[in-house]
Amino acid sequence: MLTAVCGSLGSQHTDAPHASPPRLDLQPLQTYQGHTSPEAGDYPSPLQPGELQSLPLGPEVDFSQGYELPGASSRVTCEDLESDSPLAPGPFSKLLQPDMSHHYESWFRPTHPGTEDGSWWDLHPGTSWMDLPHTQGALTSPGHPGALQPALGGYVGDHQLCAPPPHPHPHHLLPAAGGQHLLGPPDGAKALEAAAQESQGLDSSLDAASRPKGSRRSVPRSSGQTVCRCPNCLEAERLGAPCGPDGGKKKHLHNCHIPGCGKAYAKTSHLKAHLRWHSGDRPFVCNWLFCGKRFTRSDELQRHLQTHTGTKKFPCAVCSRVFMRSDHLAKHMKTHEGAKEEAAAAAQGEGKAGGVVEPPGGKGKREAEGSSASSN
């Protein structure tokens, strides 16, 4: 018996590859003539409502079969669900509710807004996507009386979210009688500013009047100028006398405090340069190639640079010589003055040796003067 069963299975296995595929019953395509209706005009209607119902849309599904819902005591059928819908009966009538503007509105809006606290925003197909309370001046959509009001305070609508705040004094922006716009501060603020400026000027005048005369400076000092600390200036400051060329009796007021020096200068800059000579500080350096010499004064550096450039800025007005330093030119001018004196002395000696020619009438005048002196 087992042998017969195995033989039958083997025969079926061997015959399976040689089996021919099932024959398909294909029919030729038929041309379809479109039906025209008077309502459609010149455009042909491809299908009629009766033909639409006869066309199969997919595998047939029996919607009459009931389904058991979790938590339900009895079976619920699709007919029972369709009877509750206000739309035309159909299997997809409950996919969209009549008050929903889109598929996801039920996520934001509860089904019964009167019995449940709503969220702070609401979506609806009106002109504005956000509804605000009536107490805050919002405009709600008339087509949705049950729309929830958002709990946003301080805003009057979505069109005014970016608007500037109202001016606290709108009457200041109104045009004046003369046609000018008062865009500046009000008159009260101007009056307060003027009063503050007057009080500041009065305080400064009182401070200047209460200041003692000895503490006032005859010459104003600039912000970058420092006070000289030489012995003469310190003594003058202690006595209350003005330290300067106007109030001092001596010409050289700023003296060197190094013991044994005693040099005095009329300018504080010269005294500072002299003190740098004592300390050995030479801040002015020549930047010429392979030079690098240092100097205590800036004018010394400038004169040194002229040796590199060869420029001579001080020409002599008498002769054609040019000098790099003004003191050299002054010394050279003395030679010209000495030559003039020598020439004048030589001309005077030549006149004495050759005889002096008397002007006409000179001898008679001398005789008259001599006779008048003897008679007296």
Curated annotation (Swiss-Prot):
Pfam families: zf-C2H2. Disruption phenotype: Develops fewer, smaller, incisors at 3 months of age in a transcription factor ASCL5/AmeloD knockout background. Epithelial cell invasion is inhibited and CDH1/E-cadherin ectopically expressed in dental epithelial cells at 3 months of age, in an ASCL5 knockout background. Residues 1-70, 164-224, 334-376 are annotated as: Disordered. InterPro entries: Znf_C2H2_sf, Znf_C2H2_type. Its main location: nucleus. It comes from the Eukaryota. It is found in: Nucleus. A motif (9aaTAD) lies at residues 118-126. Residues 344-360 have a biased composition (Low complexity). Ubiquitous. Preferentially expressed by proliferating epithelial cells of teeth, hair follicles and limbs. SMART domains: ZnF_C2H2 (SM00355). Signal peptide: none annotated. GO terms for biological process: epithelial to mesenchymal transition; odontogenesis; positive regulation of cell population proliferation; regulation of odontogenesis; transcription by RNA polymerase II. Residues 334-343 have a biased composition (Basic and acidic residues). The keyword Transmembrane does not apply. A zinc finger (C2H2-type) spans 254-278, 284-308, 314-336. One of its GO terms (molecular function) is DNA binding. Transmembrane segments: none annotated. GO terms for cellular component: cytosol; nucleus. Promotes cell proliferation. Plays a role in tooth germ growth. Plays a role in the control of enamel mineralization. Binds the AMBN promoter. The 9aaTAD motif is a transactivation domain present in a large number of yeast and animal transcription factors. Belongs to the Sp1 C2H2-type zinc-finger protein family. This is Transcription factor Sp6. It comes from Mus musculus. The lineage of its organism: Eukaryota, Metazoa, Chordata, Craniata, Vertebrata. The gene is Sp6.
